[in-house]
Regions:
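Flexible, glycine/charged-enriched surface loops at secondary-structure junctions
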Residues: 30-37, 54-65, 97-109, 210-219
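Alpha-helical support elements that line or immediately flank enzyme active sites
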Residues: 10-35, 82, 86, 90, ...
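Generic hydrophobic-segment detector
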Residues: 4, 8, 48, 53, ...
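Glycine-rich, mobile lid/loop segments that gate access to catalytic sites or pores
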Residues: 1-80, 84
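Internal helix-turn-beta structural module
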Residues: 159-221
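A short glycine/serine-rich beta->alpha loop
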Residues: 1-11, 74-78, 133-139, 182-193
């Protein structure tokens, strides 16, 4: 078979179509969703050369994607099961090959003290603002009006031309598995618009389901 079956990246086409509509609706309300490829195989430069080398070896590479949501008003989300982080994560993990997500400073927060990691409030020019954004624009599952930012990990596809070890269930013996077909050497390159789409859909769904936002949501220019 060609491609990855029900985990094929082709199936994200529908996600991107729906997400494209959500992105436009959010933009009309001053909210912008933008994702970028941050690194491939841990490197932020010479990416083309890395991918070319992987292709020549018949191997694949993982990568990281960073996403930012700007203009999101304060109060989007819920404190428990429908928190903003929860809903974004649920949508993002629908994208094949994503294995991890972190918001704000993410795992680096585990290395800090509370006095270093907390985002403090202060009044400036008559407005209440945060002095930092270590938590990625979300506190207690609810948006803080700061930019929401998160990063995702894309694993390298196991569908490569290098043979792998497997088993024959019917024969009860070890076999060598050879994969053929068309497979991307680095899925992360194609996953950028998918991450944007998933994030936009999650945010839009939360806002339309909240009477505090849905009543003043602009649907048309």
């Amino acid at each position: 078979y060609r491609g990855g079956g029900h985990f094929s990246g082709r199936l994200t086409a529908a996600l991107c179509i729906a997400g494209g509509i959500a992105i436009q609706m959010l933009e009309r309300n001053g909210i912008k969703v933008k994702a970028v490829l941050e690194s491939v195989c841990g490197q932020e430069s010479a990416i083309d050369e890395l991918i070319a080398e992987a292709i020549s070896e018949g191997d694949s590479l993982g990568g990281t994607i960073a996403c930012t949501i700007e203009g999101l008003p304060c109060g989007v989300g819920e404190p428990m099961f429908d928190g903003l982080e929860n809903r974004i994560s649920q949508a993002v993990f629908a994208i094949p090959a994503i294995k991890a997500i972190e918001f704000g400073d993410g795992f680096k927060l585990s290395e800090l003290k509370g006095s270093e990691a907390r985002d403090e409030y202060m009044v400036s020019d008559g407005k209440i603002n945060l002095t930092s954004n270590h938590n990625g624009g979300i506190l207690g599952g609810i948006s803080t009006r700061e930019a929401v930012n998160f990063r995702v990990c894309i694993k390298p596809t196991p569908s490569i031309s290098i043979p792998s070890k497997s088993v024959s269930y019917s024969r009860g013996e070890n076999v060598e598995l050879k994969v053929s077909g068309r497979h991307d050497p680095c899925i992360a390159l194609r996953a950028v618009p998918c991450v944007e789409a998933a994030a936009a859909l999650a945010v839009l769904d939360l806002m339309l389901g909240d009477i505090n936002f849905s009543g003043r949501f602009v649907f048309n220019d």
